[in-house]
Swiss-Prot record:
NCBIfam families: PRK00943.1, selD. Its cofactor is Mg(2+). This is Selenide, water dikinase. One of its GO terms (molecular function) is magnesium ion binding. The gene is selD. The lineage of its organism: Bacteria, Pseudomonadati, Pseudomonadota, Gammaproteobacteria, Enterobacterales. GO terms for biological process: selenocysteine biosynthetic process. GO terms for cellular component: cytoplasm. Binds 1 Mg(2+) ion per monomer.
C-alpha cells in the first residue's frame, strides 16, 4: 500500500513570506545604541529597508548581497524549493542587478522528514538557479524543528544603475509586474477551499523570476524599484514613500489580482500576516474597505516588482515588459508630500 503524500505545510507554523517578523517588532530587534560603522563604499545598507545590500568594488561595479529563507508555503518539496529560490533571487533583480551565484540555507527536522524530501527541495532550488543562469555553489544546513529553505545570493550591478526604494519622485506612475493574492490563494489551499480551476496558479506566479528588473535598471526614468513580498503592497509602497519623501494614490480597480481573490476573502481565506501588516502600516493609509485592506495587505511570497516610473520613461518600460511577455498598466501615481493627506490614499 502506497504511503500518503507528505504535506510540508503541516510541519510549519508559518508559510512563505507570511513568516516574516512584523515591521513593528523588527524595529525593536534592530534598534541599537551603538555607533554605526561608516563605510563610504557601502552604497545601500539597511537604513531604508531596501531589498539588498550593495557594495562598490570599483570601476563602476557594485556587488549585491542578499538572503531570504522561509518555511513551506506549498506541500510539494520540489515546488517549495523553486518558490524559495525564486523569491531569494528576486532581491537582486529588484536592485537592478544580475545574479551571479547562490548558496543554500537549509533547516530540516531530520527526525520527522526523510532526507530524500530535503533533496527534492534542494533540487527545486537548483532548477531555478539554472533558470537564472547561476550556480548553486554551496550552502549550510542545520537540524531544525521546522523545515526552512532559502538562498544567500550574490549579484552585480552598475553603480550608476542601482535601483533603491528611496529615490522615487513626485509625478512617477506606479507599475506592478505580478498580480496580488498569493497569500489568499495559498491560504485557500491550506483550508481545502481552493477550487480545481485555481490549483497551481499561485505556485506558477511565485515561480516566475523577476528577470525584467535587470533590464528596467537601464532606464534612468525608473526612479525606484522594489519587490512586493511579505509586507504586502501597502507595506512595500509605504517604504518607498517614506524613504523618498513622497506620497501615493493607488487606483484599486487597476491593481492586478489573481482570479477569485475577493471570493476567497469572503470565505475567510485571509492569512495571519495580513493583520500584522495592517497593524504596522495601517496608520499611514487613508480610508479603505475591509476587502481592500485584505487584498492590499496580503503578504506576497515571491511577488512582483513595484516600479516608480517618470512619465517620459513609460514607453521604455512598456517595451521591456513586452519583451518579457508582460503587459503593464499604471496602478497609481506618486505626489509631493502633503501633511494634510495620508501617506497612501486609495481610490476606486
Amino acid at each position: 500500500m502506497a504511503s500518503p503524500a507528505i504535506r510540508l505545510t503541516q510541519y510549519s507554523h508559518g508559510a512563505g513570506c507570511g513568516c516574516k517578523i512584523s515591521p513593528k517588532v523588527l524595529d525593536k530587534i534592530l534598534h541599537t545604541e551603538q555607533q554605526k560603522f561608516f563605510d563610504p563604499r557601502l552604497l545601500v545598507g539597511n537604513e531604508t529597508r531596501d531589498d539588498a545590500a550593495v557594495y562598490d568594488i570599483g570601476n563602476g561595479v557594485g556587488i549585491i548581497s542578499t538572503t531570504d529563507f522561509f518555511m513551506p508555503i506549498v506541500d510539494d518539496p520540489f515546488d517549495f524549493g523553486r518558490i524559495a529560490a525564486t523569491n531569494a533571487i528576486s532581491d537582486v533583480y529588484a536592485m537592478g542587478g544580475k545574479p551571479i551565484m547562490a548558496i543554500a540555507i537549509l533547516g530540516w527536522p531530520i527526525d520527522k522528514l526523510a532526507p530524500e524530501i530535503a533533496q527534492q527541495v534542494i533540487e527545486g532550488g537548483r532548477y531555478v538557479c539554472q533558470q537564472a543562469g547561476i550556480s548553486l555553489a554551496g550552502g549550510h544546513s542545520i537540524d531544525a524543528p521546522e523545515p526552512i529553505f532559502g538562498l544567500a545570493v550574490t549579484g552585480i550591478v552598475s553603480t550608476e544603475q542601482v535601483k533603491k526604494n528611496s529615490a522615487a519622485k513626485p509625478g512617477c506612475k506606479l507599475f506592478l509586474t505580478k498580480p496580488l493574492g498569493i497569500g489568499i490563494l495559498t491560504t485557500a489551499e491550506k483550508k481545502s477551499k481552493l477550487r480545481p480551476e485555481h490549483r497551481g496558479l499561485a505556485t506558477e506566479t511565485m515561480c516566475q523570476l523577476n528577470k525584467p528588473g535587470a533590464d528596467f535598471a537601464h532606464i534612468p526614468g525608473v526612479t525606484a524599484m522594489t519587490d512586493v513580498t511579505g509586507f504586502g503592497l501597502l507595506g512595500h509602497l509605504s517604504e518607498i514613500c517614506q524613504g523618498s519623501g513622497v506620497q501615493a494614490i493607488l487606483h484599486y480597480s487597476a491593481i492586478p489580482r489573481l482570479p477569485a481573490v475577493e471570493d476567497y476573502i469572503a470565505e475567510g481565506c485571509v492569512p495571519g500576516g495580513t493583520g500584522r501588516n495592517f497593524d504596522s502600516y495601517g496608520h499611514l493609509i487613508g480610508n479603505m474597505s475591509d476587502l481592500q485592506r485584505q487584498l492590499l495587505c496580503d503578504p506576497q511570497t515571491s511577488g512582483g516588482l513595484l516600479l516608480a516610473v517618470l512619465p517620459d520613461a513609460e514607453a521604455d518600460v512598456q517595451a521591456i515588459a513586452a519583451q518579457h511577455g508582460m503587459t503593464l498598466s499604471p496602478i497609481g501615481e506618486l505626489t509631493s508630500a502633503d501633511s494634510r493627506r495620508a501617506l497612501i490614499e486609495i481610490v476606486v
